[in-house]
Each structure stands twice: as C-alpha cells, then as structure tokens.
Amino acid sequence: MHQEIIARFNSLKEKQLSIDITRGKPDTNQLDLSNKLLNLSIPLVSENGIDLRNYGEPFGIVEARRLGSELLNAPVENIIAGEQSSLLLTYQTILSNYLFAEPLAWKSLKKPKFICPVPGFDRHFKLLEDFGIEAVPISLIEDGINTQQFEETINDGEEYLGILCVPRHSNPSGTTYSDENIKKMFEIGLNFSNKFLFLFDHAYLI
C-alpha cells in the first residue's frame, strides 16, 4: 500500500502540474460578484451622525449592526460590527480573557481547557494551542454536538472555559446545529458555570 501511494505521488510530480489548492480561497467568479460594491456612492455620515470616514464607534456602524441583528434574529444592542474575519474576532476574544478574565485571568489557570467538536477547524485548535489551552474533542452528530458527551465531559472536574464551534455549515463536515441542539448546549454549559463561554464562529452564516 505504501509503495503504491509513493508511486502515484511520483507519477503526479512528473506531470509538473500547477494547481492552487489553497483552502477556502474564493474563485475569480465569486470575487467578481462584489465588483460593483467598489463603485457605490454611499453617505458620508451614518444615521446617528458619525462621519464614516473617521474613526468609528467601538461597537461598529449602527447600520451594519442592524443588518447583523436581522441576520442573527437578535436585538441590535447585542450586535457588534467588528473585523471582517471571524477567526480574528475569536482570537481577540480569547486573548482578552487570557489576560483579563474575571475573577481570574485564563493565563493563571493550571490546565485550562476548551470543548471542540470534531471534525472541526484546525485553525481553532492551533489558536487554542498558542495560548496553552487544551482542545478537548467531543463528537458531532446529525443535528449538532453530542450533548450527552458534552455534559459528561465538562463535569469531569477539569477547568473548562468554553466551547468553540461552527454551528452553521460546520467546517469541514457541513453540519448545521438544530435550534434544539444549541438550546441544550446553552443549558448544559450554563448549568456548569455562568462564566462558560460559547464561541460560535459564524464564518458561513450567510
């Protein structure tokens, strides 16, 4: 088997193919969809009087927050319009808790852990690893996480800080968590601790 794989690999090398297999990179046709946005004429001042060419408000442009509110079916007061990268927002959230979490910064914990459904996003695992946080796997099932396994895992006496997952079109399986699954996740997590952090990477929400 090993020799067969090596032979196939060498055969492909001999063809000197030039293929871009960068993961998650949009096709040119997809990029073209946004071309017209570059030429839009938009107001310079937001509806609450902020000059959009200047530094913005900490929670983001109010019109963008309202759009997020509609997409997420959540109050606009609960929406922050921040970076365009969900991974960066995730990193910043973990960094702030690592340094300043109350009542104890995560950096002061001996064995901090995070729940990570698998299969999952390798960059989530690497991000946690960079902070010395152990990623503890639980299984994905048809409609979301295995809630029984989730409950058993976080109640094993260890220092679980939260869960990091992709509830909508989960990477890489494509699983979408049901409303019932997410509600059960919230119930279990909050019963464990009111400090338990639910980090939903909604990169594929739309």
Region spans (language model):
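Conserved core of the PLP fold type I
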Residues: 50-194, 205-206
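Hydrophobic "anchor" residues on beta-strands that sit immediately upstream
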Residues: 197-198
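Walker B catalytic acidic pair
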Residues: 201-202
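N-terminal "arm"/small-domain region of PLP-dependent enzymes with the aminotransferase-like
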Residues: 1-59, 63-70
